[in-house]
Amino acid sequence: MAPKKDVKKPVAAAAAAPAPAPAPAPAPAPAKPKEEKIDLSAIKIEFSKEQQDEFKEAFLLFDRTGDSKITLSQVGDVLRALGTNPTNAEVRKVLGNPSNEELNAKKIEFEQFLPMMQAISNNKDQATYEDFVEGLRVFDKEGNGTVMGAELRHVLATLGEKMKEEEVEALMAGQEDSNGCINYEAFVKHIMSI
């Protein structure tokens, strides 16, 4: 058997090594971007007198108490009735991000609504007919211009700005063919007209 080699342990090398640097402090979490507040008083009304009269007529149709006011929760409905397609988030933003309690309790007059309508109308990010059709084309597995009604119901109730089951049913009433399919181009025309 071969003799063992005398292996010397480096004693001084371990002591001379500098201590590891402390771990850097974790970076602070990125601050949430602040929602820009919309200054409704700074919005210039660009609608004609005829348009304003039409908007006021629609606004007053939503007045349930006869005081020429609507609740904040009705603003989105009036905006959509007048042909705009704002998201719920856009409506809340133009309202100043009110609490749910304020949505149902606070009321506004037409003069307060008009700058909101102008702000939404000025928004260039509004989805177009083509945007909606392209979004539904993703679900057209056969490439024949139709989507399954059941799948569309599921999408409307569970993705994005979720709709209530009653809203989905009202929206889709009379849209399905005998096979349970929906022509999505006709469907988009239908929803953009209501």
From Swiss-Prot:
Residues 19-31 have a biased composition (Pro residues). GO terms for biological process: muscle contraction; muscle filament sliding. Residues 50-85, 127-162, 162-194 form the EF-hand domain. Residues 1-35 are annotated as: Disordered. One of its GO terms (molecular function) is calcium ion binding. The modification Phosphoserine is found at S73, S99. The modification Phosphothreonine is found at T71, T87. The modification N,N,N-trimethylalanine is found at A2. SUPFAM superfamilies: EF-hand (SSF47473). Keywords: Acetylation, Disease variant, Methylation, Motor protein, Muscle protein, Myosin, Phosphoprotein, Repeat. Changing M163R: In CMYO14; no protein detected by western blot in patient muscle. One of its GO terms (cellular component) is muscle myosin complex. It is linked to Congenital myopathy 14: An autosomal recessive congenital myopathy characterized by decreased fetal movements, severe muscle weakness and respiratory failure. Additional features include delayed motor development, areflexia, facial weakness, normal eye movements, head lag, and mild contractures. Skeletal muscle biopsy shows variation in fiber size with atrophy of the fast-twitch type II fibers. Non-regulatory myosin light chain required for proper formation and/or maintenance of myofibers, and thus appropriate muscle function. Myosin is a hexamer of 2 heavy chains and 4 light chains. Does not bind calcium. This is Myosin light chain 1/3, skeletal muscle isoform. It comes from Homo sapiens (Human). The gene is MYL1.
